[in-house]
């Protein structure tokens, strides 16, 4: 049983998934900081410092905290926008890298053979 578990745990997919989960957790902290520390204060300035989370309605002595719900919706959209912008930048960087790699022409078979012949002739003359 231990051997089966070890084989399962050491498969590439499981390790890749574990790395993805750890990186995802770290990335979550970055996105949350971007939203909470940068976007939310800017939004607060734009909307006049209103804090939705404190809004509530009392119905028959029971507080309905609809403000927190609104705050979470705003946070969701800000996180979605932040992720969109981050992915957009990453995709652009990848496209630029692909264009650079495509711009470097790979030598044809003839060019490779000529290069080998040249190198052999150089070695002979030394």
UniProtKB/Swiss-Prot annotation:
Localization: Cell membrane
GO cellular component, one term: plasma membrane
Keyword Transcription regulation part of the UniProt annotation: no
Membrane topology per record: Multi-pass membrane protein
Keywords, in A-Z order: Cell membrane, Ion channel, Ion transport, Membrane, Transmembrane, Transmembrane helix, Transport
Gene3D superfamilies (alphabetical): Large-conductance mechanosensitive channel, MscL, domain 1 (1.10.1200.120)
Protein family membership: Belongs to the MscL family.
Subunit structure: Homopentamer.
Function noted in UniProt: Channel that opens in response to stretch forces in the membrane lipid bilayer. May participate in the regulation of osmotic pressure changes within the cell.
Stated name of the protein: Large-conductance mechanosensitive channel
Organism: Exiguobacterium sp. (strain ATCC BAA-1283 / AT1b)
Taxonomic lineage from the root: Bacteria, Bacillati, Bacillota, Bacilli, Bacillales
């Amino acid at each position: 049983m231990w051997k089966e578990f070890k084989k399962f745990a050491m498969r590439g997919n499981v390790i890749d998934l574990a790395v993805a989960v750890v990186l995802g957790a770290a990335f979550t902290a970055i996105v949350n900081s971007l939203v909470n520390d940068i976007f939310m204060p800017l939004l607060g300035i734009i909307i006049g410092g209103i804090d939705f989370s404190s809004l509530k309605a009392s119905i028959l002595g029971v507080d309905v905290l609809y403000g927190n719900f609104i705050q979470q919706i705003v946070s969701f959209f800000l996180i979605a926008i932040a992720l969109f912008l981050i992915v957009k930048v990453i995709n652009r960087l990848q496209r630029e890298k692909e264009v650079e790699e495509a711009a470097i022409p790979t030598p044809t078979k003839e060019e490779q053979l000529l290069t080998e012949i040249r190198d052999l002739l150089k070695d002979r003359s030394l």
